A protein has these predicted regions:
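Short, amphipathic alpha-helix enriched in basic
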Residues: 1-13
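Helix-turn-helix
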Residues: 10-37
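Short, solvent-exposed positions on alpha-helices
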Residues: 41, 62, 66, 140-148
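Hydrophobic alpha-helical connector segments
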Residues: 57-91
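Amphipathic alpha-helical packing segments from all-alpha helical-bundle domains
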Residues: 93-136
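Hydrophobic/aromatic-rich alpha-helical bundle segments in the mid-to-C-terminal region
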Residues: 115, 135-152
Length: 152
């Protein structure tokens, strides 16, 4: 995460990562088939972390409008380091998501990756917020679009 943040995803290679962490390049390929798959993993981790916050922080709110307002606050607030996950710097990960995540779905393989579930957590976050919107205003026809716009 630190290296991708420092040099950008386009300049990032497993060879550079291996040098940085004192490992050989081939050992990294055991975990990730390509740097694109690493970006997909980091993206999924970020959206799962955000979903975790949504669930934990809105679970006990019974008023639908208050729940939606809290959800919007959660997905739009400034990201700070989460001590529950000391192995990840969420502030740097957020910067990577903002700057590089479009590269995870602007590929020829996007449909196949979608079928394989790579974007499932992201879609779940959108669905959660969409459902909160519909709980406030059931007749609103574009809740998925609005939810997507809010998190982007």
């Amino acid at each position: 995460i630190i290296l991708i943040n420092d040099i950008g995803f386009d300049n990032f290679t497993f060879k550079k990562l291996g040098t940085k962490i004192g490992s050989n390049e081939s050992s990294i390929y055991r975990y990730f088939e390509s740097k694109h798959k690493l970006l997909l993993y980091l993206s999924s981790w970020y959206w799962a972390w955000l979903e975790y916050q949504l669930v934990i922080e809105t679970f006990s709110i019974s008023n639908h409008l208050e729940k939606l307002e809290k959800a919007v606050t959660i997905v739009t607030r400034t990201v700070v380091e989460d001590n529950n996950f000391a192995h990840i710097d969420e502030t740097l990960l957020y910067k990577i998501i903002v700057n590089e995540s479009s590269k995870s779905f602007l590929t020829k393989e996007v449909d196949k990756e979608n079928e394989e579930g790579y974007f499932e957590v992201y879609k779940r976050v959108i669905t959660r917020i969409s459902e909160m919107i519909l709980n406030v205003k059931k007749e609103y026809s574009f809740s998925l679009s609005l939810a997507s716009t809010i998190i982007e």
